[in-house]
């Protein structure tokens, strides 16, 4: 157990262990990597800091890095995706964990800071928060860092902006650009998991509904494909004319969000951009329309405006 960890409850570890074991048995490639790592110890003496969605699959990544000799410091990249039982089990295994489900922004910043303060050699980022904090609060560490990788489209956009402004001072690999990431994880993984979440949350049938998908990148393609497979009538909104044409040729109805707002029953944003659905769209929507965001950050739907104009709020 890591004495430095900040977790919700260590007694949750057995539940986390069961989840990790199940996932591990379905990850043959990572198991093979771990076997090599245990023999070769390529990360011996190095510190690795991770900011990822802290759940069973990323826990297996943490275990693999540790098997390679790394001292691993892990936190969540989104407070709502952190699983407390996974954090507890990783802590039991000796990973330094700083993560609690539903933490405040202040706690989230503390957790990011906690994986940076040990001065990591390698970074595994999902959304760019580690790199951003190093740049703004720990600039002296930049020369020490060997490099790292960024998983998601949103984080890569932040990194490219930093690079353009001359603010990125160590190499970062854009994992999302790899074919094995966007062709499969984004399209099939995100496509399925979005509807897993929607179905568990709403308990609504998708068939026959008009589903509006904002964005036709790889995630948007996957979401649209799964919506169609579930029997929905799919409308795609896309600002890139080439991607919009691709959606049309794939058999989907394409229109602006202004028009789609009047028709949709279920709205799913997967753009990585800010304020995709705003007040002008809320006012056009049907009563009972369901809004969902599948982007990394909670910025695609203008929830501040929605809270302001809402007649009633329930949780």
Regions found by a protein language model. Give the residues of each.
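A short, aliphatic-rich alpha-helical micro-motif
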Residues: 116-117, 206, 260-264, 282-286
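Gly/Ser/Thr-rich loops at beta-strand to alpha-helix junctions
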Residues: 50-58, 78-82, 128-130, 218-219
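ADP-ribose/adenylate-binding Rossmann-like module
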Residues: 76, 122-126, 138-154, 283-315
């Amino acid at each position: 157990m890591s004495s430095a960890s900040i977790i919700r409850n260590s007694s949750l570890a057995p539940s986390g262990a069961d989840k990790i074991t199940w996932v591990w048995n379905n990850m043959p490639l990572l198991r093979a990597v771990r076997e090599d790592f245990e023999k070769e110890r390529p990360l011996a003496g190095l510190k690795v800091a991770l900011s990822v969605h802290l759940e069973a699959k990323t826990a297996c990544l943490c275990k693999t890095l540790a098997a390679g000799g790394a001292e691993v410091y892990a936190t969540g990249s989104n407070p709502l995706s952190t699983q407390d039982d996974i954090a507890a089990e990783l802590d039991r295994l000796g990973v330094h964990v700083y993560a609690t489900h539903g933490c405040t922004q202040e706690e989230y910043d503390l957790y990011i800071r906690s994986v940076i303060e040990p001065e990591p050699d390698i970074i595994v980022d999902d959304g760019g928060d580690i790199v951003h904090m190093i740049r703004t609060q720990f600039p002296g560490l930049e020369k020490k860092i060997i490099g790292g990788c960024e998983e998601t489209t949103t984080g890569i956009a932040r990194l490219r902006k930093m690079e353009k402004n001359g603010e990125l001072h160590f190499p970062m690999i854009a994992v999302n650009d790899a074919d094995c990431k966007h062709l499969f994880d984004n399209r099939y993984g995100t496509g399925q998991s979005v509807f897993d979440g929607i179905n568990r949350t709403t308990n609504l049938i998708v068939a026959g509904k008009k589903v509006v998908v904002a964005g036709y990148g790889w995630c948007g393609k996957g979401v649209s494909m799964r919506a169609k497979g579930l029997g929905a009538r799919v409308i795609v909104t896309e600002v890139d004319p080439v991607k919009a044409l691709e959606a049309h040729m794939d058999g989907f109805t394409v229109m602006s969000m202004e028009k789609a707002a009047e028709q949709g029953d279920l709205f799913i944003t997967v753009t990585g951009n800010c304020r995709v659905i705003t007040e002008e769209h809320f006012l056009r929507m049907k009563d009972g329309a369901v809004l969902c965001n599948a982007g990394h950050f909670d910025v695609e739907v203008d929830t501040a405006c929605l809270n302001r104009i809402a007649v009633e709020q329930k949780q």
